[in-house]
């Protein structure tokens, strides 16, 4: 029986042997496609290749693409765990031709793979074609020998694929496997096609047309192929099971869940184990690709998935966070194929554990509210939207979690009411969020790239260079010239200007030629390797084809280099101090400062922050060379280079190494090794020093550090030194003794505060005074001490009441404190022998009402309350005395 890993390898090896480039899976967060929340098909990373905007070095490719469908229109979340084939995360095997082979070869490749390599019986296979696609039907007859009754013509859009309203499109041909007549269902196109007997395992898309308008469709000059085979589906077929959750991969994950919970995946618990297994995959891969749980966008979809799994863990009786304990099983099954799981192990584990720990605090309370709200509901009823929204807003229950919790009882949720409540609160969950907020792909730069090629970057070695203007863009359109006063984007054949990326800001400077000059205010990377210099023509007229001299602002670049190199050192110092789970989540490398966002679940202590700074400065003081090497990405990572989770790297990467580790597991090796395309100092000593100026949380599990280097750090320390001198002067001491002087003053203040409190206590207990009230008196035979005091804080009233109880021996005590704002605090106390007759809670509530308050609380022997009307203190004492009967 072939396992999932073997099936994946067989597929990729087969197409590699047939001339296809094996391309790694792209991240789950799509690059350069703001229309998608997550990568949901193998063709996503090739979209610009299919449309002609991008060109690759190969025209045949094959992939095993990780996919997520759990947001927007591609949302399988509700069904996951309850059906045989729904998943949030899945792998799509595919082969692609970019204008190379077409229908005949695509069908031949597919048929040979499934019947010869995979060994599926031919009599169990049938196909569909688009009803007008005679070519595909004839090829199936010729290559596979299929009869007409096993080539089903479908006239619906199910067998015609389109990228959008316009653009490439074409007919599809789907391959189905027949599980046998013991399972209900009919062939595709029949009335019973929704049954489970005939299962689609592969879809071949023949891109042969371009849709110009709804009425006009023309032939593509270079027809292409896009195919997709669900790995989990074909694994079920090859392993002789009818349910995806019975394949070896899921059996291993479910077995781990059973062992961790002590509950078998049977009966009512079967769906819960399946939900956990599926959602563990989706959550782990999303975190590995840089998504963290949050309340919006992709992060909110991740949170929905995680919390749905956590609710099912609770159904299985898990008393402690479960998901993170299952991660080793997932890594065993999928880590070899997807090494990002191994690299992100610590981050995934910490994120899963932290999110489940947080959610468990409200899960039980929320489920209790849900139980109370649905107690009178029966199958077919609906839970009102207001309650569903309260569960979301107060207890963190995503709507689909509430729906899932009510599913087995047959109770629906008023989703319109939920949406209305959401609108009123202005807290949209963005379930239909359409993208990451990135600007849409600017096609003009792809056109320029095709025409003039990519820009050669010279900035690692020089800050001055000569070049030729290859393109000018003004107001979104390509122009041939730009005159004085024009704001223009300039493309040059080669440049020393760094284009903004990886958090490092783009360079500024000047581009000049014969009779003209352009002040460059920013440099960006566009399309595929086009450096765009954005600036204003300050003199003359610049034209395409002009020779130019390019000068980077070297002072600004030097400061940026220093801050970028310091960012690397701080990153490694954070990992050494806090743990290997620390990973970069964002950065800003500017000339005046650096900002670094990183994953860490809790606040950082002052001692830890000092250690991070000291470790970075140790490497700076080494004045060690900063080396760069070009390496294959896998080799670089194997040597320990840090890669950003979710970042897409080319075949060759730039590896930046700094310093020598003096302790720990890396002792004697390079201290910091990262994949980085930015600019850096030559020696670590060029940084001067680094000073951390702030650190704090910016999101759940993400913290932000800001720091200064070099001259900026020196000026900051100088400013701090001047402040210390000014403070010392005000204290009439020296800077070295300022702290000692401050501590002495604080001790003196505490001493005086204690003496003042003692004096006030004595005054309050000393009988008649300007504070009002009286000494101990008898009220209906009960000793009563009622006092009105000022200058005593509410927290000091209870100690006064304790002293008052000693003074009366047996009786009732009431102290009312009047604050500077005329508000009153009251404490009532009853000696132990009278607790059976009087309750301090009842007494203090009577006082509170008289003071304009709303009651109080405490114990029968001591209770506290307050009120806004301090001038009614005498009435409050009278109200308490009236209760002593």
Swiss-Prot record:
Single annotated GO MF: tRNA binding
SMART domains cross-referenced by the UniProt entry: tRNA_SAD
Keyword Zinc: yes
Catalytic activity: tRNA(Ala) + L-alanine + ATP = L-alanyl-tRNA(Ala) + AMP + diphosphate
Keywords associated with the record: Aminoacyl-tRNA synthetase, ATP-binding, Cytoplasm, Ligase, Metal-binding, Nucleotide-binding, Protein biosynthesis, RNA-binding, tRNA-binding, Zinc
GO cellular component: cytosol
Swiss-Prot/TrEMBL domain comment: Consists of three domains; the N-terminal catalytic domain, the editing domain and the C-terminal C-Ala domain. The editing domain removes incorrectly charged amino acids, while the C-Ala domain, along with tRNA(Ala), serves as a bridge to cooperatively bring together the editing and aminoacylation centers thus stimulating deacylation of misacylated tRNAs.
Similarity section: Belongs to the class-II aminoacyl-tRNA synthetase family.
Function: Catalyzes the attachment of alanine to tRNA(Ala) in a two-step reaction: alanine is first activated by ATP to form Ala-AMP and then transferred to the acceptor end of tRNA(Ala). Also edits incorrectly charged Ser-tRNA(Ala) and Gly-tRNA(Ala) via its editing domain.
Protein name: Alanine--tRNA ligase
Native source organism of the sequence: Brucella anthropi (strain ATCC 49188 / DSM 6882 / CCUG 24695 / JCM 21032 / LMG 3331 / NBRC 15819 / NCTC 12168 / Alc 37) (Ochrobactrum anthropi)
